[in-house]
Amino acid sequence: MSPRPLIELQDITRSFGEGELAVPVLKGIDLKIWPGEFVAIMGPSGSGKSTLMNILGCLDQPSAGQYRFNGRDVSALDRDELARLRRDAFGFVFQSYNLLPGMTARENVEIPAIYAGMAPAERHARAERLLTGLGLGERLSHRPAQLSGGQQQRVSIARALMNGGQLIFADEPTGALDSKSSQEVIRLLTDLSRQGHTIILITHDPDVAKVARRQIRIADGELVEDTGAEMPSAQIPETDQNGRRHSRLGDWQEALKSAVRSLHSNLFRTALTLLGIVIGVASVITMLAIGEGARKDVVDRISTMGSDLLLVRPGGPDQRGGRWSVTTLVPSDFKAINEIEGVLAAIPELTGGQTLRYSNRDHSAEINATSFRFPVARQWPVVEGTFFSAQDEASYAAVAVLGKTTANALFPDESPLGKHLMVNNVLFQVIGVMDEKGASPMGQDQDDVVFVPYTTGSLRIFGQTHLRNITVAVADIDRMDEIEALIHDTLMARHGIEDFTIRNMASLIETISETQNTLTWLLGSIAAISLLVGGIGVMNIMLVSVTERTREIGIRMATGARAWNILQQFLTEAWLVSAIGGLIGVVIGIAATRIIGSLGTPIHMTLLPMALAFGCAFATGLLFGFLPARKAAHLDPVHALASE
């Protein structure tokens, strides 16, 4: 069986442009190259030799004709299959070396093996062995800028051999070197040819071309001279598949390393990109904490009145006039409500402002004439002394229980228990002090108050019996709506008309909580705009990065990177920026929230807003990083390599 050519071209043409503007660069090229040959393709600038090499190296596609590699029709291969072919069978040695400046010599050599899925230990050892064999054993950790031109070209040759290098394309490999380095590179290529590698050398220098056993000359896109093929006698090296255990996890690990290296290479730009994400995340966390703190503060204030309470007030829903001028609630109403099953306590309240006097001190406070069951109904305990009793209420006793603010105002340096104070020219004995309650939902001081028996207050202070409101404590909060309906029916039966209103504190708390939640999320939405702006910043920077690194993308594609590998690399950079920015934003958001809280603003931090803000930052990075990453993945290898 006769040997099969490694490369077979039939009537290959390549034109740039379309229609009448099309410019032919290659015209009907027919060519066979056998395994193990050392071929020099010569021609002046503009002859089409570099275009031919790009087609042979699967960096470009012919406009017409057929290209077979090792018997396989290359035109039938998709982008990823072409990438695998470049990775496993080809090696490129470029005139400008095309080494990645941010990577060491060994890391540059390892690139093809990374995309082949070779195990890290295996590829480290192989790269070191290749570089040592090329006289660079002491330059493994040097970056391209620290190497001479000849040394950089040897690194390029080692990279071409990393996956076996069955076919090596050398495009003007001596064009940027001095004579000594040029001779060294030519010697290396000759040695590789003797070892069985197929070498295709692109040059315009006849002296360089003489080292090849076969010379092909191209002029004006046509093959004008071919010294003839020579059947190989050397053993043909197979593509090196050792150590290739392709792993998705390994792909992500390498993409992460590359992303860290890329971001570190331009710290200032990375910091500016991070800033948008940091501000966005910190703003969301801070605004939501402030909004939730305000909501919780209002709800807590209302809850201090008791969430199991129903407030019955005089005046119908449509009745005009102030509540204080309406006299529709009377003592018999609260007694009737007390008889309803499920009512823990119904207490009357008759309130109004009065001036108190003790010794030479005057103080204005609210007087609340109420029932002895007030502490139970309002869940407001006495901390000193005792509350007045049913007997005190029945006997019209002149006793008083003070709120904390009132007690501190009238008795700053002594205990008020047993002392007497004057209210509306009536002398009351202080028998107790209430626990501190704090501000009401309206911001009023609930502790600036004096409690007296309802009977005493209505007769001796206010001179009236009608009530300002009835507070109803419900035994089972799940029956609030049911008890509210029973109270409504009872009062309707007694009054005949709806000259009262009932307020359900549980419903009020729920309504206010929902309203505050809406405001909280509104604040969060406003803050999220900055997060959106940060995401757009990520996209802008990534687009700039793709433009700046177009040549790097071309180098990676030439060494075997698939579209997925490029997409993965730039997506990883985007989400890494977003993740780092998100974490910093969370820390700053927590710190800012605590500082604001220390200044007296109510705040409430929970894990959900932090997780939400970080998750949004992460998702924003992926979303806005996808377009630049996709653009990078779909670049044409030959155009990317030609980019400056």
Curated annotation (Swiss-Prot):
Keywords for this entry?
A: Antibiotic resistance, ATP-binding, Cell inner membrane, Cell membrane, Membrane, Nucleotide-binding, Translocase, Transmembrane, Transmembrane helix, Transport
User: Boundaries of each ABC transporter domain copy?
Assistant: 7-245
Q: Which GO terms describe its cellular component?
A: plasma membrane
Q: Where does ATP bind?
A: G43, P44, S45, G46, S47, G48, K49, S50
EC number, UniProt record: 7.6.2.-
Q: Which SUPFAM superfamilies match?
A: P-loop containing nucleoside triphosphate hydrolases
Give a GO biological-process term: response to antibiotic
Q: How does it sit in the membrane?
A: Multi-pass membrane protein
List, in alphabetical order, the Gene Ontology terms for molecular function in this entry.
ATP binding; ATP hydrolysis activity; transmembrane transporter activity
Q: Which domain of life is it from?
A: Bacteria
InterPro entries this protein is in?
A: AAA+_ATPase (IPR003593), ABC3_permease_C (IPR003838), ABC_transporter-like_ATP-bd (IPR003439), ABC_transporter-like_CS (IPR017871), MacB-like_ATP-bd (IPR017911), MacB_PCD (IPR025857), Macrolide_Exporter_MacB (IPR050250), P-loop_NTPase (IPR027417)
| Quaternary structure, from the entry | Homodimer. Part of the tripartite efflux system MacAB-TolC, which is composed of an inner membrane transporter, MacB, a periplasmic membrane fusion protein, MacA, and an outer membrane component, TolC. The complex forms a large protein conduit and can translocate molecules across both the inner and outer membranes. Interacts with MacA.
Q: Which family does it belong to?
A: Belongs to the ABC transporter superfamily. Macrolide exporter (TC 3.A.1.122) family.
Name of this protein = Macrolide export ATP-binding/permease protein MacB
Q: What organism does this protein naturally occur in?
A: Marinobacter nauticus (strain ATCC 700491 / DSM 11845 / VT8) (Marinobacter aquaeolei)
